[in-house]
Amino acid sequence: EIISRQSIMAQLGISDARALFPCESAIKKVDNIFPRDVSIKVIQMLSAGNQRICLHGSGGCGKTTILQDVEKKLPKGSTMVVYDCYGGGRYLDSDAFRHKPVDAFIQLSNDLARLLRLPLLLSRSMNINYPKVFQKKLPSASSITASKAEDALLIIAIDAADNSVLAAQSQTPVERSFVHDFVSVGTLPSNVRLIVTSRSGNLSSLNLPPTFSLLEVENFKRTETAIHVSGNWDAPSTWIDDFHHLSRGNPRVQRYALDYSEENPAQALEYLRPNGKGLSQIFLEQFE
């Protein structure tokens, strides 16, 4: 008998993989990530024993990309699970909610199971305390991680956590985001780390305990803008100065401008003139 994905799902009594993985990540992998000082700082904090970190910054400053860079820099044998609260922008759509505790903790638990070969969390029941079940999985996940290498870490990251809270608060009646349960998880095994990311202006909505260390992700420095641009073309120094100024060093604004210019990257400045653009202005233009 051929063992297929469908036959396994049938044995588990499910017909749709979304029963096991209801909130798969929609995050796109970034190629050719260049090192930023903040990535190095995160690695230093994780290695020094900081178990709870919140990365915060303005929209488009590169928080999601920083997580990808951090994953590449983790000690040998480490594992990183990233929960995507943004969902490609669909986190407010009724058929794509990501804020509900049952969905989020099933996804997180089964991501751990998939990566570390642990038992799957299958049940959906009003009688299950999903945050508690998730926390009970951490010791075994920690042990498997430790068996891979002495310094190996297990990182569980919640990206764009503030969007999850926003989605929960937008419901009628108001609902609870899983983020508040996640940040309140109790004692962690020594090699487990929790990371959440958020826009700085929304930090208060996360209700972070004082055990979380805050680390701001700033926009690009001028030197970082130069490195970013070099992946597209060999721009003169004066052009880089103007591009950095008009984009305000925001990585996502720069990406939109460079994508707009397509095969003529020098035209990226025209996209930002005369006074520069922020993310909100770019989004408004896309809807017009």
Question: Where are these predicted regions, by residue range?
Answer:
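Amphipathic alpha-helical "lid/sensor" segments that cap RecA-like P-loop NTPase cores
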Residues: I2-R5, S200, P210-S213, D234-S280
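Conserved adenine-nucleotide phosphate-binding loops and their immediately adjacent elements
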Residues: I3-Q44, L120-L121
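Winged-helix-like regulatory helical subdomains adjacent to P-loop NTPase cores
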Residues: I8-A10, I27-R36, G59, L269-E288
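Walker A/P-loop nucleotide-binding motif
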Residues: N50-Q68
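Post-nucleotide-binding-loop coupling segment downstream of the phosphate-binding loop, primarily
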Residues: I66-I155, A161-A167
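A short beta-strand-to-loop transition that corresponds to the Sensor-1 phosphate-sensing loop
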Residues: Y86, D159-A160, V192, V196-G201, ...
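The catalytic "switch" region of P-loop NTPases
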Residues: D181-W233
